[in-house]
Every structure is written in structure tokens, then in C-alpha cells.
Amino acid sequence: MPQLVPFFFVNQVVFAFIVLTVLIYAFSKYILPRLLRTYISRIYINKL
């Protein structure tokens, strides 16, 4: 199994760390603010 070979394991850990970092950055910078803005505007419209 290539997952248990140390070189591949280190490669997978590094790649997973990079992917998670990019995903967290993208969500916090672009995706979540849009969803939050939409959510807040819907709440505001419903309370009118």
C-alpha cells in the first residue's frame, strides 16, 4: 500500500495540509462572507 510508505505518507500529509489551508482561506475570504451577507439580508427582509 503506497499510503504506508514513508515518502508517500509525507507527500500526502503535506498535500493535505496545503489543500486544507487553501480551502480555509478561500472559504473565509470569498465564500462565507457572501453566504453571510445573503443570510443577514434575508433575516432583515423577513423582519420588515
UniProtKB/Swiss-Prot annotation:
Listed transmembrane segments: 4-24
Protein keywords: ATP synthesis, CF(0), Hydrogen ion transport, Ion transport, Membrane, Mitochondrion, Transmembrane, Transmembrane helix, Transport
Membrane disposition: Single-pass membrane protein
GO molecular function annotation: proton transmembrane transporter activity
Any one annotated GO CC term: mitochondrial membrane
Subcellular location: Mitochondrion membrane
Superkingdom in the source lineage: Eukaryota
GO biological process, one term: proton motive force-driven ATP synthesis
Functional description taken from the UniProt entry: Mitochondrial membrane ATP synthase (F(1)F(0) ATP synthase or Complex V) produces ATP from ADP in the presence of a proton gradient across the membrane which is generated by electron transport complexes of the respiratory chain. F-type ATPases consist of two structural domains, F(1) - containing the extramembraneous catalytic core and F(0) - containing the membrane proton channel, linked together by a central stalk and a peripheral stalk. During catalysis, ATP synthesis in the catalytic domain of F(1) is coupled via a rotary mechanism of the central stalk subunits to proton translocation.
Oligomeric and partner information: F-type ATPases have 2 components, CF(1) - the catalytic core - and CF(0) - the membrane proton channel.
Record-stated family: Belongs to the ATPase protein 8 family.
Protein name listed in UniProt: ATP synthase protein 8
Organism: Emericella nidulans (strain FGSC A4 / ATCC 38163 / CBS 112.46 / NRRL 194 / M139)
